[in-house]
Amino acid sequence: MNFEKKAYWWEIGEALKPTQELDTLPIDTDFVVIGAGYAGLSAALTVARRGKSVIVVDGGMPGFGASTRNGGICSGQIRPSLSALRTNFGIDFANNVYSEGVDARYDLIKFCEDEKIDCQLQMTGRFTGAMSQSDYDKQCREADNLNEIIGHKAYMVKKQDQQNEINTNLFFGGMVREEIGGFHPGKFFSGLLRIAEKAGVSVSFNNKVTEILDRKTGGKSIVTSMGTINTGKVIVATNAYTGRKYNFTKFLRQRLVPTQSCIIVTEKLGIDAVKKYMPKLRMYGNTANIYSYFRPTPDRERILLGSRSFDRSEPSKKSVIYLKKNLVKIFPELIDCKVDYCWLGNVAFTKSQLPTVFQHNDIYYAAGFAGSGTVWARWLGKKAAEMAIGISNKPSVFYGPPPAKLPFYDGNPWFLPMINKYYSFKDWFKTKRT
């Protein structure tokens, strides 16, 4: 079994690193942003366009984390359903969350159009297949709830009609959300990086932040492996790649659970073959607890599928076999197709499974995008910057106190294998009952 252990999205003719490598760091700057992914660059761009000096510092290569390792599905969705949010947090908050998802998605589209980022963004819609009749019934109620909020276009597809959406007998019908789409994550990141640099953002990469110190005169000193930067304000946008090595990450890592996802991309199947399986070339998912997400690649020549990972540092044959098995469950005719690419990436969750924007000890944070960072990371990075600058734009519904700390936890998600087994059993039991 031969496959490339790297993201398919890296195979582009565009640079994924800054045009200039900094030999020295500025002594003073208005802002330091830690983390050079979608959230960090969006925050820095917002700051720079307000006339402030800003440098982004990243311990690795810019965008090397989730920003160029995701599935490229642009949903602006959150993990809890609208129904669950209304039950647990009240109707007003729940409706505001889903309304902000509409705003964030529209803002992404407008940003790509205004900045002329050719990232193959298409609002194709998404079909989510129901894994049981009870799941389909829940989707029916959720579609009704979603359509109460302006900007949502949800409708149900019965099992006998789903061949028009997806060429499979696995699902019990499903839900289509027309407002969702997808893009090429690598091309979007490359475009965002170029725009940020053009706006005056400096990016220092392969430069680890080791400490954040309070200055007696106000502001912070950012200690890095290349030197120290004095700054007025700090934005932390490290999310699922926060790590446990340095003390300054402790407050955030005790409130975030990083979870690993694994993605495969098939060999070239050809546009006709892909359309045979996915007639409307949408984004796709299912209602399993250990769910899969899948889509055509932007060139419509291959199929991408992602789900949970069994690995730590690099993809293994075990993960490829598991994901290929999931793909074949959906499309049995692909049993003999080859996998050309497989890679890993981290996503992060708060205890509430909601994204968060908050301030603590004069440091601003945007985190917890829960696997939907293609929309939320850029949007909430921008919102964190607006909050730090003091712009009076409409604040995010996610702005508030820091998320809850998890007990007996310091950033190492030791409990995830047990949770995965529990949800895998629930999925197995559900399919056996149906």
Language model region names:
Residues M1-F31, R49:
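Extreme N-terminal leader/targeting segments of oxidoreductases
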Residues G35-G37, G59:
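Glycine-rich Rossmann-fold phosphate-binding loop(s) that bind the pyrophosphate
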Residues A48-R69:
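Glycine-rich FAD pyrophosphate-binding loop
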Residues Q77-Q160:
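Dinucleotide-binding Rossmann-like beta1-alpha1 core, especially the glycine-rich loop
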Residues Y98-V102, A130-K138, M175-E197, S204, ...:
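Short beta-strand to alpha-helix junction loop
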Residues Y106, D114-Q122, V209-E211, G227-N361:
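Active-site substrate-recognition segment that forms the wall
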Residues D144-N145, N169-G232:
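Helical element adjacent to the flavin cofactor pocket in flavoenzyme catalytic cores
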Residues S309, S313-F429:
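C-terminal catalytic lobe of FAD-dependent flavoproteins
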